[in-house]
Amino acid sequence: YIGAVLDRNGLRPSRYYLTHDDRVIMASEVGVVDVATDNVKEKGRLRPGKMFLVDFDKGELIDDEAIKTSFAGKNPYQDWLNEQQIHLSDLGCDTEAHGFDPDSLVHRLKAFGYSAETLQFMLLPLVNELRDPVGSMGNDSALACLSDQSRIIYDYFKQLFAQVTNPAIDSIREEVVMSLSCSIGPEGDLLQNKAENAHRLVIEHPILTNEEAAALKHCNHRGWTTKTIDITYDIDSNHNLSDMLDDICQQGSQAIKDGHSLIVLSDRNISENRGIISALLASSALHRHLIAKFERTQVGIILETGEAREVHHFCLLAGYGVDAVNPYLAFEALWQARRDNLIDFEDNGTVVVAYRKGVAKGMLKVMAKMGISTLASYKGAQIFEAVGLA
């Protein structure tokens, strides 16, 4: 056999000729090989997501529908999905989700590096305009590594963009091929077709509400259980950052050995006596550790953090291996803004809905800059450059 398949967006040209003397010619453009017009039996182009196969033994050309039909009928794949797939709505939770604690809000906002500008220029536009805030062309602020101000680790990373061989996508006009839906959790063996391979959790949006996060933290559904790892530390501890990251990684490996399907990294225990390890550092360290141990496909990584609040932050977390994020402190900051009449929403629930919509549009825009249309392809891709970090 020899064949070809075109990407689902149709961004790569592919044209073919079938001649009367039984030759098949395929190339990115017409005219690569000279063919007499009267010798052309059939010609066409490979369309988005379509396949093309030549069977040398039978001496025939197999079209896309025949290829897919032959494989689709081998197993009851739809039945497998209906029986095995898990959705967030399937997870019942008897534990009440964390609510709003206005008394400690200011202290926690300061601990996580929030500023008045963060709320005014980043969070409020996300919910009011339902999109990532847009500024004038150019960014003349100092690089994080050269700034006189204390900057969070996310500011040291710059997003890459598609160049030459990988064209960017218009995330608005090509919305039909863009998706933030993703399956997470233990993966089956790709070499074995069996129903258990479909036993995964489908998350439609990478930003989790507090209720969804609570359901995942206390998950006990059809064999799925969760291990929560605290990423805060005692400020009087003698352990250095490297030791604490190693401990998180070892706890992650042990969770897999104990049979857990999900790992939740949480910094909710922050207090005047407990500091925080950056959520980006902790999650990326665990992700890379599990890859090195060949264990990453056996578990999903969920992040419950007050650190992430901007679109860039969520893109970084996804790019370095996080499956979903619950930005609980961003929600609380916006709820307080609603109480202060800075935004006009009916209730806290509608604020969260608007925030998730704004973040979704922003993440799709960032993915589209790299020519990537699905979150599954963007996750763990590490398409960033670190400036000033060793």
Report each predicted region and the residues it spans.
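Phosphate/diphosphate-binding loops
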Residues: 3-4, 23-69, 73, 78, ...
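Conserved structured catalytic cores and adjacent interaction surfaces
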Residues: 236-247, 255-313, 319-320
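Flexible, glycine/charged-enriched surface loops at secondary-structure junctions
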Residues: 167-174, 258-265, 366, 370-378
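Glycine- and acidic
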Residues: 33-36, 135-143, 226-243, 262-274, ...
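Extended, highly charged accessory segments
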Residues: 5-7, 60-234, 239-247, 253, ...
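Conserved catalytic micro-motifs used in adenylation/nucleotidyl-transfer and phosphoryl/amide-
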Residues: 1-25
